[in-house]
């Protein structure tokens, strides 16, 4: 990571933050893509040019709930400090309440996606340990897992 003023550059595949890290800022992507994953590696979404990520934990003042990785190319972003986000929403209590509720729903949705993926993984492992010929069911469950991994739910 290279930082100058409020501009940050991450190299391809560089870890931006991990689950459990403290949250003092959000980021506005200027160039490149950032991928967001659950703690167990389920892809939740991809954030690109003109989009913000990291705002949920920053607004809610919690540790990071997802892992953020730079994409295939360099990522350029502008850092948005916590106090700037707070100032933006402080002036409008209705907007602040809407944002907070939306962020809580997003966290819940991310957890549900991870739970579903974990359930499917468990079923696949059980099927793989059996000597029964149930390839069709197994292939179908693998397809569901791939679809879940490609869902576009953004933090």
Model-derived segments and spans:
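Regulatory nucleotide-sensing modules
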Residues: 1-39
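Short helix-to-loop capping/linker segments positioned immediately adjacent to catalytic or ligand/cofactor-binding
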Residues: 16, 87-88, 110-113
